């Protein structure tokens, strides 16, 4: 087909409404197939729809082939993707029994791969079954099962040809040439040698010609598509993408091998990753990346980090994750990649403050993962660390707004910009939901072009309505041709109509009776498609919905088994620690039902998230907490309720964060999002529900991310107008702290404004230090340099009522007031390093002698547990007196003494709960977060006046409070992985230690575990289970240890790469070149070769003369 003809034909295909309607019908029918709709319920589709659509698909393939040859990539990709979608609709559902389905599935998979839809290609091949050699090795290649592919090729080349070849002579030729082509592309994957890739493409071109000569169109199409697969493999391959970005061949190869030899090999980058990994963009001082959920942001972060460490080996890279759960996930991902390359990755332990343990870890680390609160504390209290920072990555960067945490996070970024500018470092912001990305690129990169945005996803999405009418659920799927699952859930009689002896009539009861039951029944039926997430707006809805699902599971006999035994054991132990043996949460989890919300205790939530990420839950019931960053995917999302309270609904961007979980890479070609509508309500309610659904389903309705600082300053300005304070007097009021206007007005203004000013004031004093305000003629002149590039300033430009100049004037005025409040410059460091609000910091300064007296009393005592509790009590009383926002519902009263004693002694919360109300809030919110935050601030202040011993005591107590223990040994054991306070206490009495780091403690725990196993050392059952979990995690590492050996022999052949691969077929061992042109049987020292012949990619590398050394590209093989 000529190019002009291809264009004309492609245009005709796209514009022909009749043909496009056939495709829409096939799509509409496909969802009915995969949702197991009975055939009798199908609407009347066009006669011979399969034949018509198959012809259309191959027409697209024909156009795509021509476009690819002419390097017209956009049209080529569109043709291939359209063709593969059509073939998927026709032949890729589970119960398909159509003629030639396997061939069309193979073609579908190849076309998906060519269009860079690697995930969809992988999934379709999972449904492909073929007994043919060609089909098998193609599937092995595209599903990245390189170990089995090489085994098949070994058999082909090292066994008798008659045993492994087809009976058909043409097939024998095809198989030989194709096998050779796969050998060469495997060599390209292993070595990055382009000549091997080119050779493989040349061989496939020969096969295209041969199939044409033999007049075998089915093989001709297969070879054409395979040729384009190899072309795409070149474009997407790590060998093509990574080296130009890193500009260091050695580091590039290490990174590629670390990806290639993972248990699930990564050999290419997604299209979204290639779109965002731009060499020119990476040169910017800052840039923004916008990519949908599950599109591979972490890989973009990896390459950016690696580029920094390649350029500056001693640099420190900081990854800021908004939540601990996401930080845990990122640490696992980054450490599994970088530690094999020799880089140290650490997630800093604990909550919001920097501990001595954190400082030790940062000295050794190349990459640290922190929450914003920890980053703020670390930045202000560790100058040496600050000077090392060369890269900061902000994940979930759209989280700005008027919430206090978002405001302080945004101000932290402004501080980091100052540090990075001084260090010539780089700032990167990642987000999945960022409609106004240009505002952020101007903020982060100071350039509208400092951004890349991709809308590509590894799976498509289908939206629909779950409609409950009376006791029936119908599903209406949206699309060019809508489709319907009518009577998806039909009524089931629960209790028949009855009349009592008194004549009172009771109506019959049916299931589902309400929307909750309808949602539960739909979710249960949708398990045929894959796992389901039910979204509810409020935490108190999670368990009630989960109970309905649980009851359904019991009725239907649905059982579940978690495949990952270690992760499940972690969940069991965490639940027992928090709730005791009789735990409703644990009972639900045993059924494969996962309740998830912010109300879960930290260790339980994190253990559940790890379990979900590594395994396959059946049904998850969750709030928006699950949408923020945690990488958990499902096949179907059902939005059951969007109400947060009577007047507020979930934001559109939170909806899309949740919707983004539908469609798992390498599991689902399509994610399904259902919005539940209760049509049993009034007409007005139904209308409102439909309006809400339509608003959420339109991506363009996502709220723009608005600067919290801008909103805060605008609020202060509006507040001044409400109190009728003239603008000039308002500025004086901020600068003079109540002294410039009528006292009553000042008191009223600050009573409203103080809670917002406390979010800003300590950052201003920290920035005063960074900008050396004390030596400036005007101590606030630096405000112009810093905040005219802020997000607040950029967005204030768009506000006519509150201009950007007013914003700068308000900041300057407030900075003057802050400097007056802070007093002499010698106190500034103390205030900034404390990381608490300015007013609270000043009170601490004023009462520092009183605090020192309490601490010294403890130091001079016998440091018993009672003395520790006495010091904690004094600190509780002091914290309660501070002018700082209190935790709602918590008052330090008489019952605190028993709770305090129980918490610090390691008593499980579920036991304390039996004795006192509100225990969880006191322990998890006050002692685990609020108390350590303030006590650490005190520790930082007294350290600056050279009271080192007193500071160390307070830092220890802060860590004790955060975890709920009372000595360093038990804390180290807890942090090393024994996430039970009871067990950490027990083990601390059995194990001796003197090292301050966590890693050696792990080694001591593993040694003790071996003693428990071998010598039956005394240990409780639950402690033994925690130790076993720690031991199993160590053994689960991907490393293989092999003894490095050398051999001496001579071969009369020229080897291009001086490598001989060790191959074994049955009992025979061979040394072979990668293409098997050289095959040497091993006759001597067979046992030595036998030890490593089953290890993939192990070879002999020729050294000097006749000496050969055992070696491998695989970094997970450790030679000793």
Curated annotation (Swiss-Prot):
Taken from the UniProt record, the cysteine pairs bridged by disulfide bonds within this chain are none
Query: What Pfam families does the entry give?
Result: DEAD, Helicase_C
One Gene Ontology term from the biological process aspect of the record: defense response to virus
Tell me the ranges covered by the Helicase C-terminal domain, including all copies.
521-710
Q: Does the keyword Kinase apply?
A: no
> What is the superkingdom listed in this entry's lineage?
Bacteria
Positions that bind ATP: 291-298
Q: Where is the Helicase ATP-binding domain?
A: 278-452
Write the record's keywords in alphabetical order, separated by commas. Antiviral defense, ATP-binding, Helicase, Hydrolase, Nucleotide-binding
Q: What happens when the gene is disrupted?
A: When this gene is missing the Hachiman system does not confer SpBeta resistance in B.subtilis.
Q: What Gene3D superfamilies does UniProt report for this protein, alphabetically?
A: P-loop containing nucleotide triphosphate hydrolases
Q: Where is this motif: DEAH box?
A: 395-398
Any one Gene Ontology MF annotation carried by this entry is:
ATP binding
Q: Which family does it belong to?
A: Belongs to the helicase family.
Report the function annotation for this chain: Component of antiviral defense system Hachiman, composed of HamA and HamB. Expression of Hachiman in B.subtilis (strain BEST7003) confers resistance to phages phi105, phi29, phi3T, rho14, SBSphiJ, SpBeta and SPR. Probably a helicase.
The protein, known as: Hachiman protein HamB
Which species?
Answer: Bacillus cereus
């Amino acid at each position: 087909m000529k190019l002009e003809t291809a264009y004309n034909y492609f245009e005709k295909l796209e514009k022909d409404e009749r043909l496009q309607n056939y495709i829409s019908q096939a799509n509409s029918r496909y969802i009915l197939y995969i949702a197991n709709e009975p055939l009798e319920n199908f609407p009347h589709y066009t006669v011979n729809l399969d034949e018509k659509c198959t012809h259309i698909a191959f027409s697209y393939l024909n156009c795509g082939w021509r476009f690819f040859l002419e390097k017209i990539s956009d049209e080529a990709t569109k043709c291939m993707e359209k063709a593969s979608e059509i073939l998927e609709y026709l032949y890729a559902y589970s119960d398909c029994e159509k003629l030639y389905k396997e061939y069309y599935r193979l073609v579908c998979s190849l076309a998906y791969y060519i269009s860079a839809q690697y995930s969809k290609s992988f999934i379709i091949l999972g449904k492909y079954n073929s007994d043919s050699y060609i089909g098998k090795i193609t599937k092995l290649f595209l599903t990245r099962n390189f170990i089995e592919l090489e085994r098949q090729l070994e058999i082909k080349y090292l066994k008798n040809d008659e045993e492994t070849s087809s009976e058909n002579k043409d097939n024998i030729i095809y198989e030989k040439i194709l096998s050779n082509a796969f050998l060469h592309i495997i060599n390209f994957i292993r070595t990055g040698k382009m000549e091997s890739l080119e050779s493989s493409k040349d061989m496939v071109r020969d096969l295209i010609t041969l199939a044409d000569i033999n007049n075998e169109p089915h093989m001709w199409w297969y070879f054409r598509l395979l040729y384009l697969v190899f072309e795409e493999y070149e474009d997407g391959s790590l060998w093509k993408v990574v080296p130009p970005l890193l500009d260091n061949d050695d580091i590039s190869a290490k990174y590629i091998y670390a990806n290639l030899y993972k248990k699930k090999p990564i050999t290419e980058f997604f299209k979204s990753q290639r779109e965002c990994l731009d060499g020119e963009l990476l040169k910017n001082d800052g840039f923004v990346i916008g990519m949908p959920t599950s599109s591979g942001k972490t890989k973009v972060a990896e390459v950016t980090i690696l580029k920094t460490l390649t350029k500056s080996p001693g640099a420190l890279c900081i990854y800021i994750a908004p939540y601990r759960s996401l930080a845990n996930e990122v640490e696992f991902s980054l450490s599994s990649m970088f530690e094999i390359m020799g880089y140290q990755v650490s997630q800093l332990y604990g909550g919001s403050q920097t501990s001595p343990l954190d400082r030790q870890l940062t000295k050794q680390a190349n990459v640290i993962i922190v929450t914003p609160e920890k980053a703020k504390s670390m930045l202000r209290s560790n100058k040496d660390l600050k000077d090392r920072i060369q890269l900061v990555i902000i994940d979930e960067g759209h989280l700005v707004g008027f919430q206090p945490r978002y405001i302080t996070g945004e101000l932290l970024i402004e501080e980091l910009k100052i540090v990075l500018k001084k260090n010539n470092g780089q700032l990167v912001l990642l987000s999945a939901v960022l409609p106004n990305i240009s505002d952020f690129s101007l903020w982060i990169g100071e350039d509208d072009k400092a951004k890349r945005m991709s809308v590509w996803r590894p799976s498509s999405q289908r939206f629909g309505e779950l409609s409950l009418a009376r006791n029936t659920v119908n599903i209406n799927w949206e699309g060019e041709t809508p489709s319907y699952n009518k009577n998806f859930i039909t009524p089931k009689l629960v209790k028949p109509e009855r009349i009592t002896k008194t004549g009172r009539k009771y109506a019959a009861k049916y299931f589902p009776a309400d929307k909750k039951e309808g949602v539960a029944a739909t979710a249960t039926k949708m398990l045929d498609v894959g796992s389901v997430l039910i979204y509810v707006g409020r935490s108190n809805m999670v368990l009630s919905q989960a109970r309905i699902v649980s009851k359904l599971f019991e009725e239907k006999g649905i059982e579940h088994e978690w495949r990952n035994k270690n992760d499940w054991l972690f969940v069991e132990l965490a639940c027992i620690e928090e709730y005791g043996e009789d735990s409703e949460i644990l009972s639900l989890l045993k059924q494969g039902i996962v309740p998830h919300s912010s109300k879960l205790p930290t260790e339980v939530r994190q253990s559940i998230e790890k379990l979900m990420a590594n395994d396959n839950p059946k049904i998850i019931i969750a709030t928006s907490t699950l949408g923020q960053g945690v990488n958990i995917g499902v096949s179907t999302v059902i939005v059951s309720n969007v109400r947060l309270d009577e007047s507020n609904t979930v934001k559109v961007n939170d909806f899309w964060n949740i919707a983004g979980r539908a469609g798992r890479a390498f599991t689902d070609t399509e994610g399904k999002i259902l919005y539940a509508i209760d049509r049993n309500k009034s007409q007005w309610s139904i209308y409102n529900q439909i309006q809400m659904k339509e608003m959420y389903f339109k991506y363009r309705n996502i709220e723009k991310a608005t600067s919290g600082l801008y909103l805060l300053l605008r609020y202060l300005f509006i507040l001044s107008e409400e109190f009728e304070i003239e603008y000039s007097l308002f500025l004086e009021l901020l600068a003079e702290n109540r002294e410039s206007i009528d006292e009553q007005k000042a008191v009223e203004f600050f009573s409203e404004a103080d809670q917002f000013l406390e979010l800003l004031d300590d950052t201003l004093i920290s920035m005063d230090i960074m900008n050396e305000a004390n030596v400036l003629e005007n101590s606030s002149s630096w405000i112009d340099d810093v905040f005219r590039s802020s997000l607040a300033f950029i967005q204030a430009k768009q506000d006519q009522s509150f201009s950007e100049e007013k914003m700068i004037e308000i900041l300057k005025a407030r900075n003057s007031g802050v400097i007056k409040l802070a007093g002499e410059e010698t106190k500034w460091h103390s205030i900034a390093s404390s990381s608490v609000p300015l007013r609270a910091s000043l009170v601490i300064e004023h009462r520092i002698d009183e605090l020192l007296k309490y601490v010294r009393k403890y130091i001079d005592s016998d440091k018993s547990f009672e003395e520790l509790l006495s010091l904690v009590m004094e600190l509780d009383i002091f914290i309660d007196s501070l002018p700082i926002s209190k935790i709602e519902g918590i008052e330090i009263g008489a019952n605190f003494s028993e709770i305090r004693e129980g918490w610090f002694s390691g008593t499980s919360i579920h036991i304390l709960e039996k004795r006192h109300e509100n225990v969880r809030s006191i322990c998890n919110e006050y002692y685990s977060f609020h108390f350590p935050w303030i006590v650490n601030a005190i520790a930082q202040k007294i350290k600056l006046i050279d009271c080192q011993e007193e500071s160390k005591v307070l830092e220890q107590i802060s860590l004790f409070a955060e975890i709920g223990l009372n000595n360093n040994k038990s804390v180290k054991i807890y942090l090393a992985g024994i996430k039970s306070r009871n067990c950490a206490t027990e083990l601390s009495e059995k194990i001796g230690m003197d090292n301050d780091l966590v890693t050696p403690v792990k080694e001591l725990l593993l040694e003790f575990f071996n003693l428990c196993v071998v010598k039956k050392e005394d240990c409780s059952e639950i402690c033994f289970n925690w130790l076993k979990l720690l031991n199993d995690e160590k053994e689960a590492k991907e490393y293989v240890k092999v003894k490095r050996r050398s051999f001496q022999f001579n071969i009369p052949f020229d080897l291009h790469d001086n490598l001989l691969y060790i191959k074994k077929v049955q009992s025979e061992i061979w040394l072979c070149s990668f293409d098997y042109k050289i095959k040497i049987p091993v006759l001597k020292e067979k046992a030595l070769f036998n030890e490593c012949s089953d290890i993939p990619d192990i070879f002999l590398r020729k050294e000097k003369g006749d000496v050969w050394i055992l070696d491998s590209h695989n970094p997970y093989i450790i030679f000793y």
